[in-house]
């Protein structure tokens, strides 16, 4: 038993409170492909009414949802301490852009999309106003990405229009070429993202 050295555990799951469990589970099913492994009525005396455990990979649960009718969406959350966003990583830019297309067909549009030098990210808002980031690594491996993160320039993101990136990809550009062209400003959106309207 080690009692002297800090062991580095992995982040395993996040828990969210909600008054709207069914809508939340459906949203995360559509976006992340979650499967609910268990949904139980909380015992008497619990601060919650229902608890659901869900995952989209081999881990028993990545998200837990705690439903209680007494909670409400914080309309002033940008002034309060909180979890700012939760991120999920795709293996490739094609997977990320393909997800954007799939979600758009379902009427789900992002709040923001950007090339952040070390990664490309698209941000959505769930039914309770939580910000969910979908991203992919712009470099070959995690070690290279870490070095890029350490050397970030003052401007840490370049806004992009996923539609323009998809058109360039279909025209034959590689994922790396898309990154280079995004940084050069080629895929800038026609209109600015209204980030102030989101509950960041």
Give short role names for the model-derived ranges.
Residues 1-3, 70-76:
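Short beta-strand/turn micro-motifs at beta-sheet edges
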Residues 2, 9, 19-26, 81, ...:
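Vicinal oxygen chelate
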Residues 5-8, 15, 55:
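Conserved N-terminal glycine/acidic-rich loop preference
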Residues 13, 51, 61-63, 85, ...:
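Histidine-centered active-site/metal-ligand motif
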Residues 17-63, 67:
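Core segments of cupin and vicinal oxygen chelate
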Residues 65-68, 79, 84:
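A broadly used, surface-exposed interaction patch
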Residues 68-70, 91:
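Histidine- and/or cysteine-centered catalytic micro-motif in compact active-site loops
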């Amino acid at each position: 038993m080690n009692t002297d050295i800090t062991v580095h555990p992995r982040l395993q799951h996040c828990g969210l409170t909600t008054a709207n469990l069914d809508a939340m589970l459906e949203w995360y099913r559509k976006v992340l492909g979650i499967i609910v492994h268990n949904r139980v009525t909380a015992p008497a005396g619990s601060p919650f009414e229902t608890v659901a455990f869900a995952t989209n990979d081999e881990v028993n649960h990545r998200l837990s949802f705690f439903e209680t009718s007494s909670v409400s969406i914080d309309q002033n959350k940008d002034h309060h301490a909180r979890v700012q966003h939760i991120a999920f990583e795709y293996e490739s830019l094609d997977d990320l852009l393909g997800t954007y297309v799939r979600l758009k067909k379902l009427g789900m549009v992002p709040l923001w999309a950007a090339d952040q030098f070390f990664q490309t990210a698209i941000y959505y808002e769930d039914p309770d106003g939580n910000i969910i980031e979908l991203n992919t690594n712009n470099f070959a491996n995690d070690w290279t990405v870490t070095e890029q993160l350490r050397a970030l320039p003052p401007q840490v993101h370049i806004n992009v229009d996923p539609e323009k990136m998809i058109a360039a990809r279909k025209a034959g550009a590689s994922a790396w070429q898309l990154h280079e062209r995004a940084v050069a400003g080629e895929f800038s959106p026609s209109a600015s993202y209204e980030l102030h309207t989101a509950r960041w």
